Amino acid sequence: MQQYLDLCKHILNNGIKKEDRTGTGTISTFGYQMRFDLQKGFPLLTTKKLHLKSIIHELLWFISGNTNIKYLKDNGVSIWDEWADENGNLGPVYGHQWRSWDTADGRSIDQLKGVIDQIKNNPDSRRLIVSSWNVGEIEKMALPPCHCFYQFYVVNGTLSCMLYQRSADVFIGVPFNIASYALFTMMIAQSCGLRAGEFVHTLGDAHIYLNHVEQVKLQLSRDPRPLPKMNINPDIKDLFQFKYSDFTLTDYDPHPHIKGAVAV
């Protein structure tokens, strides 16, 4: 995935050292965009092996509206462990905002169902938007949303998605985010009778943690390999009916995994 490697090069060549909330330190740039044509393969990084199981289960967890890590733990996914409280709760994070945004007048808005309805019935709308950034509930969240706002675009029978990510951990988080939102776009496209178009990834503070620099350089020394193919069960026409067994990845031939510590 040359787009990702170009991002890494851009940060190493143009980034500025900055302090951060975690105390780790970063090399950071502000404002960057990548585009992925989903008809040209599934954008799962090949310069290091990624744990696709975690990506799929986390996405299904978001879609369900769940904000407790029990489902993730039951399926061998530990990526949210550091932020959960003693009962496994994370507060009103992504899934809650997608499926039950609380309004000031006491109502609850299912943004995800709403945007799917609009894609089907008003595809030319410029309001095909879901936001995770609920200012009134940020302080209740274990971690404010990093990937916080996405918009869909329908043209010529295809569905594209653009994500705005305010904070982008380029070594660990961004490869997961690319694959997750690419798959999400494919799932919604199938649910709406459309083909998947592009995933457009817009980054705000795009950074490499200082303790990841050598790992990023190792990735840059590796040649990217052909992208794999994601096969989705064609019988599922409802986004909320997908399960883990409905996804099969083929032709994935990545370079070996590279370890890196998560900044908490």
From Swiss-Prot:
InterPro entries, per the entry: Thymidate_synth/dCMP_Mease (IPR045097), Thymidate_synth/dCMP_Mease_dom (IPR023451), Thymidate_synth/dCMP_Mease_sf (IPR036926), Thymidylate_synthase (IPR000398), Thymidylate_synthase_AS (IPR020940)
Disulfide-bond pairs as recorded: none
Pathway where it operates: Pyrimidine metabolism; dTTP biosynthesis
Location of the active site: C146 (nucleophile)
UniProt xrefs under SUPFAM superfamilies: Thymidylate synthase/dCMP hydroxymethylase (SSF55831)
GO CC terms: cytosol
Keyword Methyltransferase assigned: yes
Catalyzed reactions per annotation: dUMP + (6R)-5,10-methylene-5,6,7,8-tetrahydrofolate = 7,8-dihydrofolate + dTMP
HAMAP family on file: Thymidy_synth_bact (MF_00008)
NCBIfam families the record matches: PRK01827.1-3, PRK01827.1-5, thym_sym
Protein family per UniProt: Belongs to the thymidylate synthase family. Bacterial-type ThyA subfamily.
Protein name, as recorded: Thymidylate synthase
Gene assigned in the entry: thyA
